[in-house]
């Protein structure tokens, strides 16, 4: 059997996961009678009767083919492999406005005025889309913004070389991040070392689509009717990836199957040397949201894990990707802290009930070593959670956007909780150390007592013998 058969690779052909024209999705009656009727229309805009067109444009992922590969557990057993980050915005539906060039302002849902954010005709449709459940948004195929923590670190020079020669994309480095653009639809890899690669850039793709879009959005009164719909439709044919040196990959506008394929290439490609200490399946962390290009939005915003951005500016996505990557990395340490503390909670209770741990010195040292290793890792992650130097030095205008996104992901409060748990770990280390020292001191004390007793016995015997010898 050949290597290709072992990998279960389908025949080489184009993966058409992006429809060129929007489709209309009629209300489902049952699983057998549901049909998809293609209709030609304008690209997605949220106003009047354009909601069906938006749903149709995102319909391409419903028909995307699921490919079996070594990372199939990301799809088949996702809840077992991925741990939801411990943040309340998963369920609280908090609204945060993402600033562009001014200070950060965050609002709760009751405090927000939707008419200040959108035109009145578009406000209702936006609220309706934002309140859709996550599963419904996934079913409709809304673009995904997903972060995966899959290893301890990436070898960025090797990853850059791999993406260039196998995925046919040019990667640009921003300090500790690699940024690459993929053109959709993706095609199957040209060799057995990779599963997919970037599709060819279309001839009608403008060289400055992002700049053109941003220029129009910067105008005081954007003309919705004259807006270049072709530019907007092209934005959904571009996907972006950010690879962070501390073991996190952030995907923008990839389907779930495409994300798995690229992760499989990064895991098993390049002679397995792209990653440092790959994580086991149950240790991998995922942070997934959805986003939408909303040219009529006066300010970018995030609500109910739905991001609305007015343009495809890669610097804006870079700032948000930094926050996403830090959140998923923090989630990994939250999980490790929970597992370690749960395994050690029994011993303080036992110490309180019986006055001793009931462990050998080797077991106590081993437990202390686990806790101390976690303490060291938490101290190391404090450097990762700092504001990236790139934002301080090169793009200071993106700091408010990065700060607002961190606020939504609750990185600050979660870090404080992690630090408090570390203090508990320090106390447990101190207790274990004192218990081990007390046990050792007790052993030394008993040895001294026994030696003194032996000395007294020997001295007594010597005195008795001398007295008997003197009487003779």
Swiss-Prot record:
Localisation per UniProt entry: Nucleus membrane
Composition skew (Polar residues), residue ranges: 30-40
Topology with respect to the bilayer: Single-pass membrane protein
GO biological process terms, semicolon-separated: mitochondrial gene expression
Main localization (coarse): nucleus
Residues with Phosphoserine modification: 42
Keyword line: Membrane, Nucleus, Phosphoprotein, Transmembrane, Transmembrane helix
Residue numbers spanned by region Disordered: 1-47, 197-223
Lumenal topological segments: 1-443
Transmembrane segments: 444-464
Cellular component GO terms, alphabetical: mitochondrial matrix; nuclear membrane; nucleus
Ranges of the Cytoplasmic topological domain: 465-472
Top-rank lineage group of the source organism: Eukaryota
Quaternary organization: Interacts with sad1.
Similarity comment text for this entry: Belongs to the RMD1/sif2 family.
PANTHER family (UniProt xref): REQUIRED FOR MEIOTIC NUCLEAR DIVISION PROTEIN 1 HOMOLOG (PTHR16255), SPORULATION PROTEIN RMD8 (PTHR16255:SF4)
Protein name in UniProt: Sad1-interacting factor 3
Species in which this protein is naturally found: Schizosaccharomyces pombe (strain 972 / ATCC 24843)
Encoding gene per record: sif3
């Amino acid at each position: 059997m050949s290597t290709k058969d072992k990998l279960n690779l389908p025949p080489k052909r184009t993966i058409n996961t992006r429809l060129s024209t929007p489709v209309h999705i009629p209300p489902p009656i049952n699983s057998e009678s549901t049909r998809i009727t293609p209709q030609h229309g304008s690209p997605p805009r949220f106003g009047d009767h354009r909601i069906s067109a938006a749903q149709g444009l995102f319909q391409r992922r419903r028909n995307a083919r699921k490919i079996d590969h070594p990372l199939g557990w990301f799809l088949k057993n996702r809840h077992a492999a991925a741990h939801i980050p411990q943040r309340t915005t998963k369920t609280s539906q908090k609204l945060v406005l993402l600033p562009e060039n001014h200070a950060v302002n965050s609002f709760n849902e009751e405090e927000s005025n939707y008419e200040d954010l959108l035109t009145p005709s578009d406000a209702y449709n936006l609220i309706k889309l934002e309140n859709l459940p996550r599963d419904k948004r996934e079913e409709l195929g809304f673009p995904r913004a997903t972060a995966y923590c899959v290893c301890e670190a990436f070898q960025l020079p090797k990853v850059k070389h791999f993406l260039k020669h196998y995925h046919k994309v040019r990667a640009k480095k921003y300090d500790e991040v690699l940024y690459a653009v993929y053109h959709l639809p993706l095609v199957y890899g040209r060799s057995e070392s990779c599963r997919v690669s970037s599709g060819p850039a279309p001839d009608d793709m403008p060289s400055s689509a992002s700049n053109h879009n941003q220029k129009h959005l910067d105008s005081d009164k954007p003309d919705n009717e004259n807006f270049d719909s072709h530019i907007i439709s092209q934005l959904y044919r571009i996907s972006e990836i950010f690879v962070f040196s501390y073991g996190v990959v952030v995907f923008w506008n990839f389907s779930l199957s495409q994300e798995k394929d690229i992760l499989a290439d990064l895991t098993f490609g390049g002679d397995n040397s792209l990653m440092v200490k790959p994580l086991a399946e149950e240790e991998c962390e995922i942070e997934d949201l959805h986003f939408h290009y909303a040219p009529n939005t006066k300010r970018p915003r995030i609500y109910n894990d739905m991001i609305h951005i007015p343009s495809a500016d890669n610097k804006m996505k870079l700032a948000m990707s930094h926050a996403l990557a830090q959140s998923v990395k923090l989630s990994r340490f939250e999980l490790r802290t929970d597992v370690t503390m749960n395994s050690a909670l029994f011993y303080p209770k036992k110490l309180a009930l019986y006055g001793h741990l009931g462990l050998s010195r080797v077991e106590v040292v081993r437990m202390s070593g686990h806790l101390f290793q976690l303490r060291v890792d938490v101290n190391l992650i404090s450097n990762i959670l700092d504001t990236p130097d790139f934002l301080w030095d090169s793009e200071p205008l993106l700091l408010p956007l990065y700060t607002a996104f961190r606020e939504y992901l609750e990185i600050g409060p979660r870090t404080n909780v992690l630090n408090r748990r570390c203090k508990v770990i320090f106390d447990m280390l101190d207790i274990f150390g004192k218990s081990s020292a007390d046990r050792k001191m007790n052993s030394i004390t008993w040895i001294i007592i026994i030696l003194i007793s032996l000395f007294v016995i020997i001295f007594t015997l010597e005195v008795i013998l001398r007295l008997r010898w003197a009487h003779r």
